[in-house]
UniProtKB/Swiss-Prot annotation:
EC identifiers of the protein: 3.1.5.1
Catalysed reactions, semicolon-separated: dGTP + H2O = 2'-deoxyguanosine + triphosphate + H(+)
A Pfam family recorded for this sequence: HD
Top-level class of the enzyme under EC nomenclature: hydrolase
CDD domains xrefs: HDc
Protein name per Swiss-Prot or TrEMBL: Deoxyguanosinetriphosphate triphosphohydrolase
């Protein structure tokens, strides 16, 4: 096991225009303050205020959006980070672990990773992801790329269809088809900060949001040693070279994770579990009394000193006995949140310290709050009650289905851009308006400048005389469409769909 030295992980250099001659703790901290400013002032963070947390298209400002959720995660992440550093200080291990002059950057990386953790999520959350992946799967059929004979390949894109005698190209076709059918919010977040927004963050800060380490083009089983870390796609083919450089800069082995990412993940787990239940009460899906009974029933028999008793029952009793003229709802959730944090944050911090050798190496194949403890059981309780009584509610399911239809419909509306031949689309990109393509010209104009420039830059770097050029061009064209639609807010996607379907002016 390598020696734990966080000076080898908290890399303050950047991909472009990296600061030179940095020596003091204050100078390093200023670099991470610059990261903080770039992140907080980015349009992608502002768009989170109109993206779904649980309830799409919600007009009640008391119900959480992705932005308010991310701010709560940021606070919990800071709390866990401070708890870890405090315990390491008590153990006199800060200097031994190379953290004595890096406590500020340690906290800042965690906080900003928490704020950014949902930055790549599409409109309508997981149903938006499913809509994008299903739409591309129906056209690219990545599963057929593994089958024989080649005549069984149902891919509707000629450039990506497998061909006899072209095995090196066929392997690239397989990778591209798999990659495009595995859109994922975490992978899109990496693409956003590096390729689309060009935020030029420090290597350590980007490492903090690389939650999953599986490439989106991965086919087959994942290694048992990394099955949790590779549970979902973490980055796309378009960012393969960047991630390879990131691993080198952060001393990460293949498919391993950056240490501070475990803290971000734990903060997210703690935050959304209570928040989803509070939002459900705000939405009148159930009353706070009904919620308490749901929690009590799901936990089952317990003794007075159990975690359920100390956290949930305690919150319930305090909220009922409060003599102040405040609502039971507000009081219950205040106590529930405080009790939950006071139990789970120290537990997550200690789990981080206890497993630090594996976490530092990036190979700890679990979440911090995923074990056989009562703390893990408490999180499962909150999640299970939400699944049973919130996510399955007819109003929630109706809005999710509408969101799925909106994203699928938008992809279908923009499909003519993917149907153009390579030469025709190249002409459209160069001229921006082509008379014989009136529909395609208008659709192309609607794409954002940022996304169009990302496409042009990527394609301009490709050798145009290479046999791989048509494959890569089509890949980046699909990415262009995924970038544009996934970057929409819920409300913009909803309005755009209705306008283009001529439902309203």
């Amino acid at each position: 096991m390598a020696q734990i030295d966080f000076r080898k992980k908290i890399n303050w250099h950047r991909r472009y225009r990296s600061p030179q001659g940095v020596k003091t703790e204050h100078e390093i901290l200023r670099i991470f303050e610059s990261d903080r400013g770039r992140i907080i002032n980015s349009p992608a963070i502002r768009r989170l205020q109109q993206k779904t947390q649980v309830f799409p298209l919600e007009r009640n400002a008391a119900v959480r959006t992705r932005l308010t959720h991310s701010m709560e995660v940021q606070q919990v992440g800071r709390y866990i980070a401070k708890e870890i550093l405090s315990r390491l200080k008590e153990l006199k291990l800060l200097e031994a672990y190379g953290l004595d002059e890096l406590t500020g950057p340690f906290e800042s990386i965690v906080e900003m990773s928490c704020l950014m953790h949902d930055i790549g999520n599409p409109p309508f959350g997981h149903f938006g992801e499913a809509a994008i992946n299903d739409w591309f799967r129906q056209r690219l059929h990545p599963e057929d790329a593994e089958s024989q004979p080649l005549t069984d390949d149902r891919c509707s894109v000629a450039a990506l269809r497998l061909r006899d005698g072209e095995e090196p190209l066929n392997e690239l076709r397989r990778k591209i088809r798999q990659d495009l059918c595995h859109f994922e919010g975490n992978a899109q977040g990496i693409r956003l900060v590096h390729t689309l927004m060009r935020m030029n963050l420090t290597w350590a800060q980007v490492g903090g949001i690389l939650k999953y380490t599986r490439p989106a083009w991965w086919r087959g089983e994942t290694p048992e040693t990394h099955h949790y870390l590779m549970k979902k796609p973490g980055y796309y083919l378009s960012e393969e070279a960047y991630i390879a450089r990131l691993r080198k800069e952060l001393n990460l082995a293949l498919y391993s994770r950056f240490p501070l990412t475990w803290i971000m993940e734990a903060a997210d787990d703690i935050s959304y579990c209570v928040a989803d239940l509070e939002d459900a009460v705000e939405k009148r899906i159930f009353t706070v009394e009904q919620l308490y009974h749901h929690l009590h029933e799901a936990w089952g028999q317990h003794e007075k000193g159990s975690l359920f008793s100390l956290v949930v029952e305690n919150a319930w009793e305090k909220s009922r006995s409060n003599s102040l003229s405040r609502s039971t709802e507000d009081q219950f959730f205040m106590y529930l949140r405080v009790n939950t944090l006071n139990k789970l944050v120290p537990y997550a911090a200690q789990r981080f310290i206890d497993n630090l050798p594996a976490i530092f190496a990036g190979t700890f194949n679990h979440a911090l709050l995923e074990d056989a403890s009562e703390c893990s059981d408490l999180l499962k309780l909150y999640k299970n009650v939400a699944v049973k009584h919130v996510f399955s509610h007819p109003d929630v399911e109706r809005l999710e289905l509408q969101g799925y239809r909106v994203i699928s419909g938008l992809l279908e509306i923009y499909r003519p851009l993917l149907s153009l031949s390579l030469s025709d689309f190249t002409e459209l990109v160069e001229k921006e308006r082509v008379k014989r393509f009136p529909i395609e010209s208008r659709l192309f104009h609607k794409l954002s400048t940022r996304h169009r420039l990302a496409y042009v830059e990527a394609v301009s770097k490709l050798p145009s005389d290479s046999p791989e050029f048509p494959l890569w061009e089509y890949y980046y064209r699909c990415r262009l469409l995924q970038d544009y639609i996934s970057g929409m807010t819920d409300l913009y996607a909803w309005d755009e769909y209705r306008r283009l379907m001529a439902v309203e002016q």
